[in-house]
């Protein structure tokens, strides 16, 4: 079965097609890709260079997710992945790498350093990862580092459990949302180690923080906001938890949630969105059973449905399972997948397009204070 799937993937995305196209746009194009509650985001710069942040799921989902990433690569017209950032070593962020690397060259591998959460499921993945970066360039990112991408200012603001100490230009004002924060008393995980990036293209600004935890978000944003504001927030943690101390001072005009059908979008997280000052829209990769109709966004802002579409979305949010009991398997979505495409201009204007229904919305450039 796997050989059949591999054949189909190669048939749809042959190397000659993947590398024949050359990028010729004057926009920064961002592809937020559906990897079923994992993460994969492709940045295609006007220079022709590309940055991929994470590679989706491993295991049975690896071929599926690699194919979805390659579809975005083809649309972007990039010839290789110049910089691959692995935010952290969880299977939904790095699992698809080995499969992807068989179909497209990857020039540089960027990560946070040593794994702090070894285990039987992730150790073989990291062994294969080490074999890949041994053949290319490997960089351990530190807060304050810059990734050289023509036309972009790409700053690392978090990595390896550390955060940026010096505010970005124009940032550094006191953050009024810090006072009410209560630290979460939990052991550190790979999420705490996440590589976080702040990207500037002319006057357009966006951020992607992987699964950076609330405690590390506090370290980054308090007592002073070291980042300033953004136009687009590519949400951390799949939209599972959204903190006022991060979202509110960033003051995004739009946000994209790379969630799954039962991952991201619980009521408390959605309430933070809906009360966020200046946030016009939230775009969701999937409708979320965790939010139900009660807390969801309009359907035109949702990219993906299920293999067996529902006649209606439940009104009430899905109740969590009893403590100590696992949730039942999530509904399947292994068929056609749609992504969000963002096209940003140097003046700060950007357009988000839902490729499922063709709906797009343009957010005009505007003067923004921190």
What do these predicted regions represent?
Residues 2, 7, 19-370:
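Non-globular, low-confidence helical/coil segments that flank catalytic cores
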Residues 12-20:
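C-terminal segment of classical bacterial N-terminal signal peptides
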């Amino acid at each position: 079965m796997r050989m059949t799937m591999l054949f189909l993937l190669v048939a749809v995305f042959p190397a000659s097609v993947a590398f024949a196209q050359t990028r010729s746009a004057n926009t920064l194009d961002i592809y937020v890709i559906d990897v079923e509650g994992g993460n994969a985001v492709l940045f295609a710069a006007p220079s022709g260079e590309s940055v991929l942040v994470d590679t989706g799921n491993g295991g049975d989902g690896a071929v599926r997710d690699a194919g979805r990433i390659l579809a975005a690569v083809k649309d972007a017209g990039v010839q290789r992945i110049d910089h691959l950032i692995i935010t952290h070593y969880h299977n939904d962020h790095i699992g698809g790498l080995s499969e992807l690397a068989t179909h497209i060259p990857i020039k540089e591998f960027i990560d946070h350093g040593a794994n702090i959460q070894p285990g039987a499921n992730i150790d073989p993945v990291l062994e294969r990862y080490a074999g890949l970066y041994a053949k290319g360039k490997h960089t351990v990112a530190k807060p304050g580092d810059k990734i050289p991408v023509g036309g972009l200012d790409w700053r690392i603001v978090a990595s390896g459990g550390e955060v940026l100490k010096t505010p970005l230009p124009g940032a550094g004002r006191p953050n009024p949302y810090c006072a009410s924060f209560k630290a979460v008393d939990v052991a550190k995980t790979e999420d705490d180690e996440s590589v976080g990036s702040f990207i500037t293209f002319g006057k357009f600004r966006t951020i992607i923080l992987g699964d950076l935890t609330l405690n590390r978000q506090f370290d980054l944003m308090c007592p002073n906001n070291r980042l300033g504001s953004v136009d687009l927030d590519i949400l951390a943690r799949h939209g599972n938890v959204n903190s006022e101390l991060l979202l509110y001072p960033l003051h995004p005009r739009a946000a994209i949630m790379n969630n799954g059908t039962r991952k991201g979008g619980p009521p408390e997280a959605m309430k933070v969105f809906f009360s966020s000052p200046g946030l016009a829209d939230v775009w969701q990769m999937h409708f979320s059973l965790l939010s139900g109709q009660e807390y969801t966004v309009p359907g035109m802002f949702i990219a993906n449905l299920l293999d067996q579409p529902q006649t209606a979305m439940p009104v009430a949010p899905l109740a969590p399972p009893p403590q100590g009991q696992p949730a039942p398997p999530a509904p399947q979505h292994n068929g056609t997948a749609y992504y969000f495409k963002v096209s940003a201009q140097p003046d700060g204007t950007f357009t988000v397009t839902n490729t499922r229904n063709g709906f797009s919305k343009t957010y005009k450039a505007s003067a923004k204070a921190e």
